[in-house]
Design a protein with these regions (language model features):
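Mature catalytic domains of secreted/periplasmic carbohydrate-active enzymes
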Residues: 1-173
Length: 173
């Protein structure tokens, strides 16, 4: 209670929450995404490779920017937030593949950020093969690796700010 009284905008996260816990805490799904929109806001935490920097991850390759974009769009359409980790090398720098990933994500966000920031769940979150597919979350998450396709569409809405404006629905493929 002290923390909330000190900073009412503070967010406390938890991994395994029941409906009562979700009234006070933000559900944090590790490396996973629910298959349906959630009534309460939630987040997934993931990384482009392993949680810690390693040459093995560098050699194996990281998630592509397109994979993370697909995840981000799916997460936002289900009332979620993406917490993305890009590990640093021991000297505090990023490697060349991480820098390329960051540049590609930056380009996508500059072009499409309007469909992410300030948006809300629309009356339907999506269409396509993955809408009907079951992808259960195990324990606290760990259901990453969904293969999105061009047939998977996700929807969000940005509500009008004034009475003269209209709501904008974004469909991302």
């Amino acid at each position: 209670a002290h923390s909330y009284n000190t900073d009412p905008e503070m967010v406390v996260t938890g991994k395994v929450l029941d409906s009562t816990h979700k009234e006070a805490m933000l559900w944090d799904i590790e490396r996973g995404i629910p298959d349906r929109p959630q009534e309460k806001p939630w987040q997934t935490c993931t990384c482009i490779g392993g949680w810690h920097y390693g040459v093995k991850d560098y050699n194996a390759g990281y998630k592509s920017a397109q994979q993370v974009v697909d995840m981000l769009v799916d997460i936002v359409s289900k009332n979620g937030n993406l917490l993305l980790s890009i590990p640093l090398k021991g000297d505090g720098t990023h490697d060349d593949k991480e820098m390329r990933f960051i540049a590609e994500m930056t380009d996508w966000m500059e072009q499409n950020g309007r469909s992410i920031y300030g948006t809300r769940v629309w009356k339907t979150f999506g269409e396509g093969p993955l809408v009907d597919a079951s992808n259960p979350i195990y324990n606290q998450g760990f259901n990453e690796g969904i293969n999105y396709s061009a047939k998977d569409v996700r929807y969000v809405v940005k509500h009008a700010r004034t009475e003269q404006d209209v709501d904008t629905v974004f469909a991302t493929i």
